[in-house]
Amino acid sequence: MAVEKDQQKDAEAEGLSAATLLPKLIPSGAGREWLERRRATIRSWGSFVDQRRFSRPRNLGELCQRLVRNVEYYQSNYVFVFLGLILYCVATSPMLLVALAVFFGACYILYLRTLQSKFVLFGREVSPAHQYALAGGVSFPFFWLAGAGSAVFWVLGATLVVIGSHAAFHQIEAVDGEELQMEPV
């Protein structure tokens, strides 16, 4: 009995941390592994937003160098900035929330229906891929009315501006051995 309670507490503690950092809605597989790797390689948010480390680049060469190095160094942070902008866009657009609810509701209904029996339409069995395509087709008018196309381009534009600005103006750390070395001619 005591062992079961300890295991349950461990599972709850483990589930709590996983629930706060990684949604359980993401199925195990390639997507979850990718997100776990991103979360594991995330850099310190303190150094990411440290205002003392922002300055104007001296020339175009330094700007390009900063862009490349910062995108490489803060890649995981930038992924989470992108995901945050997506969540912001969805949360501030009620019609987009309705369209997403219709789409995911249709997918869930199809999922439950396939657990009970195979889906037959006009005497033919419909594959799961075609069923989800049908759910997307049914949801398409809702996405169109919600302005999902403009939301996608808003997210892409905002991401490019935020990440591009950060990468361009955030000073890169000097790493030993990567200094510019002059060779005699």
From Swiss-Prot:
InterPro entries: Prenylated_rab_accept_PRA1. Its main location: membrane. It holds the Pfam family PRA1. The chain crosses the membrane at residues 79-94, 95-112, 132-148, 149-165. Residues 30-54, 175-185 are annotated as: Required for interaction with prenylated RAB3A and VAMP2. Residues 175-185 are annotated as: Homodimerization. It is a multi-pass membrane protein. It is found in: Cell membrane; Cytoplasm; Golgi apparatus; Cytoplasmic vesicle, Secretory vesicle, Synaptic vesicle. One of its GO terms (cellular component) is Golgi apparatus. Keywords: Cell membrane, Cytoplasm, Cytoplasmic vesicle, Golgi apparatus, Membrane, Synapse, Transmembrane, Transmembrane helix. The keyword Transmembrane applies. Residues 1-78, 113-131, 166-185 are cytoplasmic. Residues 165-185 are annotated as: Required for interaction with GDI1. Homodimer. Interacts with VAMP2 (synaptobrevin-2), prenylated Rab proteins, GDI1, NDRG1 and PCLO. General Rab protein regulator required for vesicle formation from the Golgi complex. May control vesicle docking and fusion by mediating the action of Rab GTPases to the SNARE complexes. In addition it inhibits the removal of Rab GTPases from the membrane by GDI1. Belongs to the PRA1 family. This is Prenylated Rab acceptor protein 1. It comes from Bos taurus (Bovine). The gene is RABAC1.
